[in-house]
């Protein structure tokens, strides 16, 4: 079904800067709303329930799966992540633009359901920089960092499945690129026709 709102789906390997870019975009564009995913992993640092993620027990997550409450869900780095079907559909059905941070598996699955979803992949400028960012983050052991780098090879190979790719070398430039993608999507004929349906009908544009 065509909804008037736009759905932007952002994926990246750990350490590429996805969350920082999305946060910066939302500070610049108040018209875009975050879609908060559910996860079984524990909070990191200053993360809060309902802000970065809804943190669930495995049993709570199982219950949502059984109720078919997730648009998609997947195993990522040893934990489960899911996207609430109701949260997404309600917002874009009311003309809201929604941005979702998710893994590449979930992004591709969402595109199958919402064909108008805009998939954006964030790449690091190099393997060396990706390793350095993971180390500077200070959240993972050396063993976990190596696992994340190994998984990153698989994840980045899927960038070809996405509509847009941003290389996050200079943060300010990457934010500009992300904002440009959002603005350009809103001006596409198909997006304008969905968002401004009454205007198109009044102008007799099919």
Curated annotation (Swiss-Prot):
<keyword id="KW-0547">Nucleotide-binding</keyword>
<comment type="similarity">
    <text>Belongs to the guanylate kinase family.</text>
</comment>
<keyword id="KW-0963">Cytoplasm</keyword>
<dbReference type="Pfam" id="PF00625">
    <property type="entry name" value="Guanylate_kin"/>
</dbReference>
<dbReference type="GO" id="GO:0005524">
    <property type="term" value="F:ATP binding"/>
</dbReference>
<feature type="domain" description="Guanylate kinase-like">
    <location>
        <begin position="5"/>
        <end position="183"/>
    </location>
</feature>
<dbReference type="GO" id="GO:0004385">
    <property type="term" value="F:guanylate kinase activity"/>
</dbReference>
<dbReference type="GO" id="GO:0005829">
    <property type="term" value="C:cytosol"/>
</dbReference>
<dbReference type="InterPro" id="IPR008145">
    <property type="entry name" value="GK/Ca_channel_bsu"/>
</dbReference>
<protein>
    <recommendedName>
        <fullName>Guanylate kinase</fullName>
        <ecNumber>2.7.4.8</ecNumber>
    </recommendedName>
</protein>
<dbReference type="InterPro" id="IPR017665">
    <property type="entry name" value="Guanylate_kinase"/>
</dbReference>
<keyword id="KW-0418">Kinase</keyword>
<keyword id="KW-0067">ATP-binding</keyword>
<feature type="binding site">
    <location>
        <begin position="12"/>
        <end position="19"/>
    </location>
    <ligand>
        <name>ATP</name>
    </ligand>
</feature>
<dbReference type="InterPro" id="IPR020590">
    <property type="entry name" value="Guanylate_kinase_CS"/>
</dbReference>
<keyword id="KW-0808">Transferase</keyword>
<dbReference type="InterPro" id="IPR027417">
    <property type="entry name" value="P-loop_NTPase"/>
</dbReference>
<comment type="function">
    <text>Essential for recycling GMP and indirectly, cGMP.</text>
</comment>
<dbReference type="InterPro" id="IPR008144">
    <property type="entry name" value="Guanylate_kin-like_dom"/>
</dbReference>
């Amino acid at each position: 079904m065509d909804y008037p709102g736009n759905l932007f789906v952002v994926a990246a390997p750990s350490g590429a800067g996805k969350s920082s870019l999305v946060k910066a975009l939302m500070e610049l564009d108040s018209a875009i709303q975050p879609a908060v995913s559910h996860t079984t992993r524990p909070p990191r640092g200053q993360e809060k329930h309902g802000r970065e993620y809804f943190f669930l027990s495995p049993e709570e997550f199982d219950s949502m799966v059984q109720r078919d409450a997730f648009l998609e869900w997947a195993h990522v780095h040893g934990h489960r992540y899911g996207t609430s079907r109701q949260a997404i559909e309600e917002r874009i059905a009311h003309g809201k633009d929604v941005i979702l941070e998710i893994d590449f598996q979930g992004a591709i699955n969402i595109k199958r359901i919402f064909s108008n979803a805009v998939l954006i992949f964030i790449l690091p400028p190099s393997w060396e920089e990706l390793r350095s960012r993971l180390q500077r983050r200070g959240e993972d052991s050396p063993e976990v960092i190596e696992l994340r780098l190994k998984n990153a090879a698989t994840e980045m190979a899927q960038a070809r499945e996405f509509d847009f790719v941003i290389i996050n070398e200079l943060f300010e430039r990457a934010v500009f690129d992300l904002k440009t993608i959002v603005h350009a999507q809103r001006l596409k004929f198909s997006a304008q026709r969905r968002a401004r349906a009454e205007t198109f009908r009044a102008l007799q544009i099919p």
